[in-house]
Amino acid sequence: MHKTVLLAESAFQLNLKKGDVVVDATLGMGGHTIELAKIVGEKGRVIAIDMDAVAIREAKNRIKKEHKEFLDRIIFVKDNFKNIDKIVAGQGTSAIKVKGVLADLGWRIEQINDPAYGLSFNVDARLNMRLDEAGDSPEDSEDAFDIINSWSADDLERLFRELGEERFSKRIVIAIKEARKEKEIKTTMELANIIEESVGHRGRKGERKIHPATKVFQALRIQVNSELNNLNVFLENALKVLEKDGRLA
C-alpha cells in the first residue's frame, strides 16, 4: 500500500485548528485526509477530492475500517482538482473560503502497477494512461494509444522533448514510425520494447538505473491527463478559495 510521506509536516504547514474547513485536493489512499480530519475535529470538515473513482472507493473503505469516527467530517468529491473553486462553493459546508488547501502531487504506486491504467512499462497493458478511473473519460479524449498511433512524427518528437526532456526523441520517433507501418502499437510493453531497441542505455551517463522508456512514458502521462494545464488552473483557483490567512501546501 502507498505510504503517505511528510504527513505531519504537511498538516503542520497549514496551521489548522478545530472547526476549520480544509481541502485535500489529492485524496489518494486517504493518508492526508485522515490526518486533517483528526486536526479539524468534529466541527471541522475535510473536502477530499480525487478524479479517480477507484481511489475514492478504496480510501472510503480504509477510513471506514480504521477511522470510522472521522467519516462525518469528510466530504468525498470525484472531480478534477482544478475545479476546486466550484467544488468548495457547491459542498454545503457554509464556507465560501477554506482555511487550507493541501495537494500531494504525483501518482500512487497502486495506479502505476494496475494494468487498467496502462501507466507502466513494467506491467503489460493497453496503452491508456488516463488517470480518470482507468479510462473513464470523454469518448473524444485522447489516450496514449491514440497519441502514439495517430500523432505526426514532428508532434511526437516535440512532446517527448518538451514534456519528457528526452534527448533521444528523434531516434525514438523514427522507431515508432517504422513500427506503425507494420501494425498499431497497442500495449505498454510493445512501446517500451521499441524504445529500448532504438536507444538502449547508450549515452545515458548517470541514468543507468532508469528504464530507457521512462521519459517517454512521463511525457505521455502528462499529455493524456493535461497535468500542466490542470496544475496551473488549480493553483489559480486554490487561491480564490483560501481565507485571507489561509495556506496552500
Task: Go through each PLM region and give its residues.
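S-adenosyl-L-methionine-dependent methyltransferase catalytic core, i.e., the SAM/SAH-binding region
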Residues: M1-A249
